[in-house]
């Protein structure tokens, strides 16, 4: 398996003649330091892996100092910089041009989680209400985007634009973490100015037409009474003296017959 994978990467190793190492231990990465070139890379790897070890929790892929991914055949972990000699022999790809296929089933978790994170950020950016408490502390940029979205929906949503204290307090209190408090405070101060301006408006301005609202706002869809009454008259529901929900005790044929007779008494003969 490893020889086949090494043959696919022919001619791309910087420290081997014709692309392959001489010694099989060096080729498989079993030695402590496979080559002098790899020994020079160990010093920047210590600081890089110490920083990335807190954010990357995937066992199959291991970030390298050259922005490549080393896929291990055994369960790899994010450790110092030295290759784990106690584990199974692992084929190491230190070149960033070659991305090895995932050997185990855990290898697909990295792109899948990145896609899921992209979908979550897209959902949070388009949602009208603040859900900053659902976001982890590792994404302060998403918190800034959500605060900007709250400013966009400040004037469109009549439920949250009543006074100056509601948007300002929600912008500063719902943002988690130390980094989020600064962004929440900024959004709260900007929202308080817009809220105080909208609080002086008359009550009729709060009833915004549904065409001016964004399509994501579901619970602010208003129903016109004239349109509703025209539908009731058109369907003949005003001539029915008893509601159809009260006829659930009878069978379906009797219900449909009585319903049609009451709706059109002159056309249908029972």
From Swiss-Prot:
Induction: By hypoxia and deferoxamine. Residues 138-201 are annotated as: Disordered. Pfam families: CITED. The keyword Protein biosynthesis does not apply. It is found in: Nucleus. Gene3D superfamilies: 6.10.140.2200. The keyword Nucleus applies. One of its GO terms (molecular function) is SMAD binding. Interacts (via C-terminus) with SMAD2. Interacts (via C-terminus) with SMAD3 (via MH2 domain). Interacts with LHX2 (via LIM domains). Interacts with WT1. Interacts (via C-terminus) with EP300 (via CH1 domain); the interaction is stimulated in response to hypoxia. Interacts with PPARA. Interacts (via C-terminus) with TFAP2A, TFAP2B and TFAP2C. It is linked to Ventricular septal defect 2: A common form of congenital cardiovascular anomaly that may occur alone or in combination with other cardiac malformations. It can affect any portion of the ventricular septum, resulting in abnormal communications between the two lower chambers of the heart. Classification is based on location of the communication, such as perimembranous, inlet, outlet (infundibular), central muscular, marginal muscular, or apical muscular defect. Atrial septal defect 8: A congenital heart malformation characterized by incomplete closure of the wall between the atria resulting in blood flow from the left to the right atria. This is Cbp/p300-interacting transactivator 2. The gene is CITED2.
């Amino acid at each position: 398996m490893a020889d086949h994978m090494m043959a696919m990467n022919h001619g791309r190793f910087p420290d081997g003649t014709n692309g392959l190492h001489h010694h099989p231990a060096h080729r498989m990465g079993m030695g402590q330091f496979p080559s002098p070139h790899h020994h020079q890379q160990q010093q920047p790897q210590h600081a890089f892996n110490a920083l990335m070890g807190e954010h990357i929790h995937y066992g199959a892929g291991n970030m390298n100092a050259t922005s490549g991914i080393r896929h291990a055949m055994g369960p790899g972990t994010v450790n110092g910089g030295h290759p784990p000699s106690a584990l199974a022999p692992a084929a190491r790809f230190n070149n960033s041009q070659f991305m090895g296929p995932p050997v185990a089933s855990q290898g697909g978790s990295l792109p899948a989680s990145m896609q899921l994170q992209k979908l979550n950020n897209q959902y949070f950016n388009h949602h009208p209400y603040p859900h900053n408490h659902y976001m982890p502390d590792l994404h302060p940029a998403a918190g800034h985007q959500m605060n900007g979205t709250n400013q966009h929906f400040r004037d469109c949503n009549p439920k949250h634009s009543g006074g100056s204290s509601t948007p300002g307090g929600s912008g500063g209190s719902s943002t988690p973490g130390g980094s989020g408090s600064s962004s929440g405070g900024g959004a709260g101060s900007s929202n308080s100015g817009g809220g105080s301006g909208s609080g002086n408006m008359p009550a009729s301005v709060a009833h915004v037409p549904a065409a001016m609202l964004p399509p994501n706002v579901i619970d602010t869809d208003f129903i016109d009474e004239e349109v509703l009454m025209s539908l009731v008259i058109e369907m003949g529901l005003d001539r029915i003296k008893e509601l159809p929900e009260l006829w659930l005790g009878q069978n379906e044929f009797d219900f449909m017959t009585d319903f049609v007779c009451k709706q059109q008494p002159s056309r249908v003969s029972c």
